[in-house]
Amino acid sequence: MKNDLTIAKIKHTDFAELYDKFIIGKKLNQKQYETLLAIAICFTNADDINVQQWGYRIVVEYCNQTQDYMPLYEIAINKGLYPVSKFIERHYIDDDQRNFFTEWNDAFTEQYISGDICRSEQQDALIKFFEKKYNNTISISAPTSYGKSELILSTIKEYKGRKICVLTSTKALLTQTKKRIQQISKGIFPKVVVHPEMYNSKDVSCLAVLTQERLLRVLKKDPALAFDCIIVDEAHEILENNARSRILADVIIVAQKRNPDVAFKFLTPFLADSKNLKIRYTTYDIEGFKVSEYIKTEKYYLYDLKNHTGLKFYDQFLNKFLPISGDENLGFEENVVKKYSAEKNIIYLNKPLDIEKFALDLAAVLPEVKSEIIQRACDNIAEYLQPQYNLITCLRKGIIYHHGSVPDAIRIYIEDLYKENEAIKYVITSSTLLSGVNLPAERMFILDNRRGRSNLSHDSFKNLVGRVCRFNEIFNNDSGTLQRLEPQIYLVF
């Protein structure tokens, strides 16, 4: 039976009024919850993909409000979202709810478990596709958390004794990537080349992690260097119209000219068509794999400081704002962040000066953190830099920040502190975060809609919000929660 529901049709029904109350958390009676759930299940079977996703969002919200996760369990099983169903089976299904079907589903999903990770249907298909194409040029388009880092590691192992390069778009991502692959590369490659001066043309094999500028210098240094494989992380950046994207295109052209059989692995969180990665003057063909699963469903909030309209919820399906605290006036951005923050928060700003200024403003309204580890960290940083360094003031209040001016050694140190210490709740960062740097967070506050000299593009915005509530945080067996299937994104202007 055809289900031709569209959002335009649904907007003009009584359902929209009930949904508005539900989505901003107003208390409903049992009959209203049952009505919402029945309609949501109907939506998940619609032909329109937007209606399907809206139905899924309603089911997730229903389950988080009522703590009845059986509807989400059944939908997750049917849609191949096995990390969701497995987490529910382990944490929310009581013994008296178990039956033949739950036991059969449990046994069925075992095939999608690898170590401590349960893969979704498309995640499993992605890995199988990648493993069959080690020697081919391919593109992988998958959201954050779909295991692109694991694909990089497996490729490095596959190219043992050969020449392989991982291209990263920023020095921050370069450092993070090097740290991740260093352990598995021992015994496979003599070293990890991260700077042109480290490269030795006499080495038979080579594992390099470089930005496009550094790779270009290495290629100029050794005209005979020919790579067997180049992994291009954050490959969508090649489509941007700027000097760095042109350098990236240049090194790809040179690499293929030197070795026509070089295998390129283009990894990106979004891509409309893999053919868009075909560069002029190259001859490679691209096979693409694109993930279309919808597991996380973001909740967007707008706090309008200029017009004093308080907090509003933005519904991306109905394209409208719903007031939550219309008479509230918190006055300044730091007060909004303080009131609506969670245990771990990412705050986005565009300029280094704005980042440091806001970090100090936020520090001024927060209490000092009582932690020996934080005190020791402040002492260590004071020895490395001048004691008046703003970062130390912020660190004492549970805040870190990083941008291009923060030394690499300090940045790595404070990132590890943020990941491992509950006392540090806030990280304030720039577009570095868009380049694949991964930090745990439950909520995001976007205080600037610009990236560099232009506005955040649609794709950059999606990439940014995708950094919140990664799968390893949602489905962690000890600390995970399905509340994180609904990451909260606050836009404060």
PLM regions: where:
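N-terminal helicase ATP-binding lobe
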Residues: 1-493
